[in-house]
Amino acid sequence: MAFYLSAPQSCPYLPDQDELLILSDPQQVLGSASYDALLQKGFRRNGGLAYRPACPRCDACVSVRIPVERFRLDRGQRRVWQRNQDLQVAVRAPHWDAAHAALFGRYQRLRHPGGGMDEESLRLYQEMILETGGVDAKLLVFSLAAEVVAVALVDIVPAGVSAVYTFYAPEMSARGLGVYAILWQMAWTRSLGLPHLYLGYWVPGSAKMDYKRRYRPLEGFVAGRWRVLPETTGAR
């Protein structure tokens, strides 16, 4: 598989840093087998492309995963788990759904004030959901009665389940839906007999990514191998 370097752009996580990515060839279909190998080397998927940071002045991004058999809930996570036992979860193939898109728009307005579901964000949403690169992707749809309150896009490969993106009802923040989605994915990964839940990149110093270190044990891909990260925030 061929790879290319992206053009540099501002880092979305750390100020005063530029982001440079290694990207897979968009003319080649990823497929589950190829992506499984790439995921284990620190790559992630966005639409039909696999990518990995290759920033010239920074190596803060650490690909992380949870060994699901060894994970134990802490007190706060246990409360979130119990609080959301009234939710139903359906596993679906990726598809367009207007209610999901509307929920995504509400979530984006919370995460990016002043934004919303404009034409560009709608296009990005469609690409994220529908362009899977030949990878076995699923939508996890969390509902309260008949109302969809959270949606998680995940990939399934032999190495485990990879959490691609999760969005949820911002007005239900007291439920901890983002945390519950991760906890549910861990239980589901275990039920599938798979070893790891991949959470993407953890970036020390980024408030957006700090939540990932609360799941223990947490393994990071550092210096070409996976290892358990220390309880403190520094990965190196």
Where are the language model's segments positioned?
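Conserved donor-binding loop and adjoining core beta-sheet/short helix segment
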Residues: 1-44, 48-70, 144, 152-162, ...
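A structural signal for short, well-ordered beta-strand segments and their strand-loop junctions
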Residues: 46, 141, 196-200
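A conserved beta-strand-loop-helix scaffold within acyl/acetyltransferase catalytic domains
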Residues: 49-56, 66-174, 214
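Active-site/acyl-donor-binding loops of N-acyltransferases
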Residues: 52, 62-69, 196-236
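Active-site catalytic microenvironments for nucleophilic, acid-base chemistry
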Residues: 110, 184-192
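Nucleic-acid nuclease catalytic cores
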Residues: 161, 165, 169-175, 192-197, ...
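Conserved acetyl-CoA-binding loop-helix of GNAT-fold acetyltransferases
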Residues: 174-187
